[in-house]
A protein has these predicted regions:
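Non-globular, low-confidence helical/coil segments that flank catalytic cores
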Residues: 1-207
Length: 207
């Protein structure tokens, strides 16, 4: 209905308006159409990706976008060749695209379990990811080793440990790991950030 009304108004404007009015009208319509796709303030969204959550941080106008974990689903009843069933295509990916996101400034993987990082390849295929952040030592986890290296050609990979600070609007403080691990639960990347006096503590599956 709304789309039909918009088309009618555009046609009416083309017939009756002067050139200057047409330009102003089209600019106004573009703002009307595109503005709802971009956050007007810092937004934090917890996306249900199945067994776990994916947390999305968006600054004003999507100038900066950070994603913590991708989710992932393991099908224990399938053959080994089809063991991992990707579900990002109907959970996280539609959410990000619906928010007008095309580039992710930082993608954090808290640890190597599939329910936290199993869909990372799908995200790397669908979006431009500037930096992939993992806990120090996690690159040796088998689930990381199995990832397609071709997907990382345009993405920097950075290992983090306690004391590191990354990101802009918001900035994330790394509280753990204290030492190099192997990407297991006990080695989870723990992040803290503050947005408008609200403190967020993201702990992965830290034991």
């Amino acid at each position: 209905l709304w789309f039909g009304i918009v088309i009618f108004l555009v046609g009416l404007a083309c017939v009756t308006a002067t050139q200057t009015h047409r330009i102003l009208f089209f600019v106004s319509m573009m703002v009307f159409i595109l503005l709802p796709r971009f956050p007007l303030k810092t937004a934090v969204s917890f996306v249900d990706v199945g067994q776990g959550d994916s947390i999305v941080f968006q600054s004003f106008g999507n100038q900066k976008v950070y994603v913590v974990d991708t989710g992932g689903k393991v099908n224990f009843y399938a053959n080994d060749s089809d063991k991992v069933t990707k579900n990002a295509e109907y959970t996280l990916i539609p959410f990000l695209k619906g928010e007008g996101i095309r580039q992710i400034d930082g993608l954090f993987l808290t640890h190597g379990d599939f329910d936290h990082m199993g869909d990372v390849e799908e995200i790397l295929r669908e979006f431009s990811v500037e930096t992939l952040y993992v806990a120090e030592g996690m690159l040796h986890h088998q689930n990381m080793v199995n990832l397609d290296p071709k997907l990382f050609k345009q993405t920097a990979v950075v290992e983090l440990r306690q004391g590191d600070r990354v990101g802009v609007h918001p900035t994330f403080e790394v509280l753990s790991p204290f030492e190099k691990g192997t990407g297991e639960n006990k080695d989870s990347l723990v992040l803290a950030t503050v947005i408008k006096e609200v403190r967020f503590l993201l702990m992965g599956d830290l034991e």
